[in-house]
Amino acid sequence: DEVLGLSELPESMLIIGGGVIGCEIGQFFSTLGTEVTIVQRGEQLLPFEDKDVVKQLQRQFKKDKIKVLLNSGVDSCEVVGDEVVSTLSDGKKVNTQYVLVAIGRRPNIENSGIEELGIELNRGKIVVNENLETSVEGIYAIGDLINTPMLAHVASKEGIIAIENAFGKSKTVDYTAVPRCVY
């Protein structure tokens, strides 16, 4: 959240994560002249997008001199002088002025009392059935709390469906054609 408020333009930046946020921020800073390296654990950037579209993006990133390291991770980062030395999973080191962690968000449900209610969690998300009901009958969850696309319009639709189901309906959300964009 703080990266766009930097008081000076970084000379170099390592971005951990090649999802939407990592790619958008990387391209933004590259356009301004920052030397950008993106490290992505998976085999492609934007893992939820079409492979052909991602190939085009990677070609553009190459033209923009954005370095992309796929199937790689960052094991550690250490501030040394005015640089950050990042050690990659293959042992190589990358020196940059800044490191941006863009590996996604998780719901902040610690100390919320959810576990005391007996609501089942899986990897930090609330488990729901097809009707958005949790493991506790009569309690529903939507949006970023559950394992569905983290988009406002998805959460809005889920909210409508959850309310209808709380009043006795048995409706589900169709996730097959969720509009989204990458800037």
Task: Give residue spans per PLM region.
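FAD-site-proximal beta/loop scaffold in flavoenzymes
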Residues: D1-P10, N95-T172
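Rossmann-like dinucleotide-binding cores of NAD(P)H-dependent redox enzymes
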Residues: L4-G5, P10-L14, V20-V85, S89-D90, ...
